[in-house]
Amino acid sequence: MARKITKKEIEKPDSFQAVLNKVGAYISSNKSKIYLVSGIAILIIIISAGWYLYRMNYEEKAQRLYAIAHITGMKSARQGATLDQNSIKMYSDVITQYPGSKAAMMSYYQMGNMYYDLGDVDASINAYTEFLKEVPDGSELKILAYNSIGYCYEKKADLPRALESFENAANAKSGKGFEGMTYRNIARIYEEMNNKDKALEYYQKALNSTADPSMGLFLKKIISTIN
């Protein structure tokens, strides 16, 4: 049986309507503030959307220029052409025209590789260092860049700084796939520094990290030779 509605309940104001009335009264008395806040919110949305579209277009153009440089370099390599400053300039143009882009970051990495191949290890170190300023921690290229800097210092016979670079690679947060290579690099530097104990320690770490049977045999031979 349905509950009988009392006269008091009928005459009682509708609570929802009362809330609407209060909201309407607030809006009427605070129009200027509401318009200001709404305008700011809309402006923020427009700016955010505009910035997002701008960055998308910016990155797309940068990537296009980077792709041209990369494809040109690959074609030259297939044709047996030697590296030259023109190849490096193409990547340099990406950095100059689109600083802060992902393509510019990768251009530093490619330039590091190219300078090393050309024998300009100081320029190679500078390029890799710029790359490391931008690359995220999760990227395996970070480990490769640290190792590459280590090779540069090793080529300069600066063993302490080479060791530091290889240790930076070993301490990076990613790059488990390059762990064995990094340990071998550290071990080799310790061996060159005549620190046999540390060399053995890291050759053993490299051995424990490798899944390649031929590399495993090679490392065992080195370890037995040092012992």
Regions found by a protein language model. Name each.
Residues 2-40:
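N-terminal positive-inside, membrane-proximal cytosolic segments immediately preceding the first
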